[in-house]
Amino acid sequence: MIIPWQDIAPETLENLIREFVLREGTDYGAIEISLQNKIDQVKTQLEKGEAVIVFSELHETVDIQLKAKF
């Protein structure tokens, strides 16, 4: 189920994005980018509709995915 990012409290959204970018395996290329820049990039993708927040009822987990993949 897609959860609109606008329905999530700002602090919760920030924490969700932070957890997402800190996951092992999240690759931003050869150039090191600051944590805040990574968070800002993901938030921009959510705002533009390029990424979505997905809740899995089966696993009771939340994830951020590219809209094209979902």
From Swiss-Prot:
InterPro entries hit by this protein: UPF0270 (IPR010648), YehU-like_sf (IPR036685)
Entry superkingdom: Bacteria
Pfam families recorded: UPF0270
Residues spanning the membrane: none
Similarity annotation: Belongs to the UPF0270 family.
NCBIfam families linked: PRK04966.1
Name assigned to this protein: UPF0270 protein VP2791
